Design a protein with these regions (language model features):
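Substrate-binding pocket helix/loop in short-chain dehydrogenase/reductase
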Residues: 71, 99-101, 108-113, 208, ...
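Catalytic loop of short-chain dehydrogenase/reductase
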Residues: 140-162, 167-176, 188-189
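Short C-terminal tail/terminal secondary-structure segment
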Residues: 95-98, 232, 243-258
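Catalytic Tyr-X3-Lys loop
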Residues: 102-121, 136, 140, 163, ...
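A glycine/serine/threonine-rich, flexible loop-to-helix segment
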Residues: 176, 188-215, 256-258
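Alpha-helical segment proximal to the catalytic Tyr-Lys
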Residues: 129, 172-173, 240
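Short, small/polar-rich loop/turn modules that mediate ligand/substrate recognition or access, typified
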Residues: 175, 180, 242-244
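Conserved glycine-rich cofactor-binding loop
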Residues: 16-18
C-alpha cells in the first residue's frame, strides 16, 4: 500500500531508540525524510545511519524537550536542514517516580508534565502555522494506556491523560485546516533499554510470569513494529478521516471498554 507521504518531513522526539526509533524507521520506509532528537550522540548517530540506509535524508539532534531553548533550536535546525515539518511525532516521555500521591513531590510532578506534555505542546505550537499554510499536517502524540485508565504512578498517569485531552482539543480546533491530530496509547511494549526490559531484569521470573499471566492476554509483552506501522498510517494520506482519536495498541491489555 502506497501511503502517499514520500518526500514529507517528519520530526520525532525521543527518536533514537525504542518506540521513537521504530516510528522513524517506519516513516523512512515510506520515503519520509526524518529528523530525530535524543539526549545522547551515540544512539542518535546509530539510528540516523539506519534511516539513511533506507534512501532518505535524516538528521539527529541532541535536545532536551523539557527545555524551551532546546525546543526552539530543534525546530529551527530541522526546518533549515530538511524543510518545514509535515509530520510531528511527540514520543519523548517517561516516568520519573513510582510513587502514589503521598510519595510524589510537586517538583517531580511538574517535571513529569514537562517531559510528557509541555515539550510536545511547545513543538505543536511551532509546527502548526506552516501546516496551516500548507493545508496539510499530521501530529501524533504517544500517550499510554495509563492515560486512559488506572495504572503506573500518579504523575505519569496524569500527564498522559492530559496529553490525550490536548490531542482531542487540538484535533477539533484544526480539523478544517487539513491537520490531523491523534494519540496512540501503547500497552506494555518491550524495547531495548525500555521500562519493561528493566522490569524483567529487576524482578524474579515468577514475578514477571505473574504479571504476564494477570495482565497480558497474548501471553507476552508487546513488540514495537506494530506501533511504528500505526504511526506511518496515521501520518499518511490514507488516514484522512481519523482525527481526535486515541488508538490503543496493547494486545488486549486494557480493561476499559471505551
Amino acid at each position: 500500500m502506497d501511503l502517499g507521504i514520500k518526500g514529507k518531513v517528519a520530526l520525532i522526539t525521543g527518536g533514537s531508540r525504542g518506540l521513537g526509533r521504530q516510528s522513524a524507521l517506519a516513516l523512512a520506509h515510506e520515503g519520509v525524510d526524518v529528523a530525530i532528537c535524543g539526549r545522547t550522540e551515540k544512539s542518535l548517530s546509530s539510528t540516523v545511519t539506519e534511516i539513511k540506509k533506507l534512501g532518505v535524508n535524516s538528521l539527529g539532534i541532541i535536545a532536551d524537550v523539557t527545555e524551551s531553548a532546546d525546543i526552539g533550536s530543534l525546530h529551527s535546525e530541522v526546518c533549515e536542514s530538511l524543510g518545514a515539518v509535515d509530520i510531528l511525532v511527540n514520543n519523548a516521555g517517561g516516568s520519573l517516580s513510582r510513587e502514589d500521591i503521598e510519595g510524589t513531590s510537586l517538583e517531580d510532578y511538574k517535571k513529569t508534565f514537562d517531559l510528557n506534555l509541555f515539550g510536545g505542546f511547545e513543538l505543536m505550537k511551532l509546527v502548526i502555522p506552516q501546516m496551516k499554510e500548507n493545508n496539510w499536517g499530521r501530529i501524533i502524540n504517544i500517550a499510554s494506556i495509563y492515560g486512559r485508565e488506572y495504572g503506573g504512578n500518579i504523575s505519569y498517569m496524569s500527564a498522559k491523560a492530559a496529553l490525550i485531552a490536548a490531542t482531542k482539543h487540538s484535533a477539533i480546533s484544526l480539523a478544517k485546516d487539513g491537520i490531523l491530530v491523534n494519540s496512540i496509547a501503547p500497552g506494555s511494549i518491550e524495547v531495548p533499554e525500555g521500562s519493561w526490559e528493566r522490569f524483567q531484569n529487576e524482578n524474579s521470573p515468577d514475578v514477571v510470569e505473574g504479571f504476564i499471566s494477570d495482565n497480558l492476554p497474548m501471553g507476552r509483552f508487546g513488540w514495537p513494529e506494530p506501533l511504528g506501522d500505526l504511526v506511518a498510517f496515521l501520518a499518511s494520506n490514507r488516514s484522512g478521516l481519523i482525527t481526535g482519536s486515541c488508538i490503543v495498541i496493547d494486545g488486549g491489555q486494557s480493561i476499559s471498554m471505551i
